[in-house]
Structures are given as C-alpha cells and as structure tokens.
C-alpha cells in the first residue's frame, strides 16, 4: 500500500486537465462562497464609495466616515445594504466564475487560443483555469462579466439606492416597489449601459493582468523557494484589480449617478457631459481610492478562495479517478 502515496503525490501537478470537466455546480458554489466572503467583509468600503460618488460635489472619505460614525447606529450604518450587496456579489460571482470557466474550457479546446503553446511555455502555475492567449483572456473575462451583470442588475440598483442617503427606504422590498411604481421595470436596469461599459473592460483587463502577473510571479520565483499558490493568486489578484480599477473608474462614477438620479442624467453620454460641466473632470474619479482599495481586497479574496477551492476539489477528483483505475 505504501506505493500508492507516491503516485498520488506525483500526480498533483498534473491535475489541470481535469478542470475541463469540472462539475459546474462546484464552480457555482465556489464562486458563491468567494463572493459572499468578500462582499460581507468589505461592505463598509462599498458603502463609503457610494456616498462619496453620489454628491455633485464629492465629499472626502474622512468627512463621510465622520458623518456615519456620528450617527445613532454607526456600526449598523457601515454595513447598511449588506444583504443586497451579498446577494449581488455572491450570486454575481457564482454566475461569473461558472460562465468564465465554461467559456475558457470551450476556447481551450480549440486552436484559436494557443492553449498547448501556453501550457508548454509557462507551465501550469497556480491557476485552476485553462490557459488562454491574451486576447482570449480579455474576451472571456469581458463576456462573462457582462452576462452576469445583466442578470444581477436589479439587485445592483437596489443595493445602490439602499446604500445612498438620497432615499429613505426602510427595506429592500419598499425600495423595489417604489422603483417599479415610479420608473417601471426599466428602472431596475438603470445604468446598465454604464455598468456594462465599466465591467466589460474591467473584467477583461483584470483577467488579462491577473493571468500575466501569476505567470510573472511564478517565473521569477521558480529558481527560489516556491511560494504557495494562494499567495501568488492573492498578490496577483490585488495588483490586477488596482490596475483595472484605475483605468475604468470613470464608468463606475457615471454608473452611480445614473442609478441614483436617472431622471437628471438620462444616459451615459449626457451624464458624462453634465458631470464634467458641473463638477469638473475630477468627478469622474470620485471614490477612486476607495474603489481601488475595495476592489484590490475583494478581488484578491474572491479569486484566491475560488481558485483554492477548485484546485483542491480537482486534486481530489484526480486522485479518485486514479484510484478507480487501480
């Protein structure tokens, strides 16, 4: 029986191909857990970003925090909107990771992505996902994010309205009822254009930067003591999110205004014109520091948790398959 341990231990690095046939339900569950973890822990930062961006004259983070802390229930107010945020991020992440895995697995089986060349060139690294070319990383990340964003858009609108102090909604139900009554079902999709314009390039750039950073970190540490896959994923996730966030922040600022005041701003182009004319170019970068901080932490947490869950599950599935052949 002692001979069984060695083949299993040696087999671990070769479990990557199993990701092509990973159970969809497990990818959904891993994405859900990773999204819930990051959204609940980082809800105060998300709320602060919404409050800073909502004003025609964006207030400072310090003054916003001071106002919340001086309220009757500061801790509760910092986590205001946690339920819609957790629903949006949790199920949004589940849909996103499931779609992303399906797209990447499908593309990896074609000759369009140079899958084999990539694997031979850089090795398996710390990723639980199939390796793709730069353009495929960009395209799959963007497509999966926009699809998940559309499905979760009503929850996103409820979250933003509930977090804002523009509205006095006492519950998510009252918020949803008021939006449908005054704006129709269309109101639940306010700002989708700006959201898609933000999420598509953000997600595409994120996956591109994330995979490249993991390859770079794996290559630069290959001659020294190898760090754990989780540490490589965490650092890569944080850096990739910071870069992608800085590039796409104007779309996020516009999206927030559209979801809070759709009657005033109307559409994305009109919103940009009004914001620049009334508040200057700096309004397009309102909440940038908060968004970078939150996105860096949330993406690092979400992707690390997701990839570790998938890697461990696939190792187990691979061992089970190997044992079944004995």
UniProtKB/Swiss-Prot annotation:
What molecular functions are annotated in GO for this chain?
Answer: glycine transmembrane transporter activity
Q: Which GO terms describe its biological process?
A: glycine import into mitochondrion
Q: Quote the function comment for this protein.
A: Mitochondrial glycine transporter that imports glycine into the mitochondrial matrix. Plays an important role in providing glycine for the first enzymatic step in heme biosynthesis, the condensation of glycine with succinyl-CoA to produce 5-aminolevulinate (ALA) in the mitochondrial matrix.
HAMAP family xref list: SLC25A38 (MF_03064)
As recorded in UniProt, coiled-coil segments are none
Q: Which family does it belong to?
A: Belongs to the mitochondrial carrier (TC 2.A.29) family. SLC25A38 subfamily.
Topology versus the membrane: Multi-pass membrane protein
Reaction equation(s) it catalyzes: glycine(in) = glycine(out)
Give its localization.
Answer: Mitochondrion inner membrane
What keywords does the record list, in alphabetical order?
Answer: Membrane, Mitochondrion, Mitochondrion inner membrane, Repeat, Transmembrane, Transmembrane helix, Transport
Q: Where are the Solcar repeats?
A: 22-106, 135-216, 228-312
Q: SUPFAM superfamilies per the record?
A: Mitochondrial carrier (SSF103506)
Query: What GO CC annotations are associated with the protein?
Result: mitochondrial inner membrane; mitochondrion
Provide the protein name: Mitochondrial glycine transporter
**Transmembrane residue ranges:** 28-53, 81-107, 138-163, 191-214, 232-258, 287-305
């Amino acid at each position: 029986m002692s001979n069984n341990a060695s083949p299993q231990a040696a087999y671990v690095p070769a479990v990557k191909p199993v990701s092509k046939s990973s159970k969809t339900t497990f990818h959904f569950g891993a994405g859900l857990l990773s999204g819930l973890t990051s959204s609940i822990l980082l809800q105060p930062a998300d709320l602060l970003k919404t409050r800073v961006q909502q004003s025609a004259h964006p207030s400072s983070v310090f003054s916003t925090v001071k106002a919340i802390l001086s309220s009757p229930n500061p801790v509760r107010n910092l986590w205001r909107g946690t339920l819609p945020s957790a629903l949006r991020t949790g199920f949004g992440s589940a849909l996103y990771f499931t779609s992303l895995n399906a797209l990447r697995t499908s593309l990896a089986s074609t000759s369009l992505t140079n899958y084999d060349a990539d694997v031979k060139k850089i090795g398996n690294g710390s990723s639980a996902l199939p390796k793709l070319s730069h353009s495929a990383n960009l395209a799959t990340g963007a497509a999966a994010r926009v699809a998940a964003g559309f499905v979760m858009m009503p929850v996103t609108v409820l979250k933003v309205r509930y977090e804002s102090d523009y509205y006095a909604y006492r519950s998510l139900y009252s918020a949803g009822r008021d939006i449908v009554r005054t704006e129709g079902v269309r109101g639940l999709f306010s700002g989708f254009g700006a959201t898609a314009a933000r999420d598509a390039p953000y997600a595409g750039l994120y996956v591109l930067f994330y995979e490249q950073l993991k390859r770079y970190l794996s290559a630069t540490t290959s001659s020294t003591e190898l760090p754990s896959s989780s540490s490589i994923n965490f650092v890569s996730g944080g850096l990739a999110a910071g870069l992608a966030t800085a590039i796409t922040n104007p779309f996020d600022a516009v999206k927030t205004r559209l979801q809070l005041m759709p009657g005033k701003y109307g559409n994305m182009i009109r919103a940009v014109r009004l914001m620049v004319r009334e508040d200057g170019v700096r309004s397009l970068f309102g909440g940038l520091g908060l968004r970078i901080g939150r996105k860096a932490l949330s993406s690092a947490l979400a992707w690390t948790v997701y990839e570790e869950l998938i890697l461990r599950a696939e190792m187990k599935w691979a061992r089970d398959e190997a044992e079944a052949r004995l």
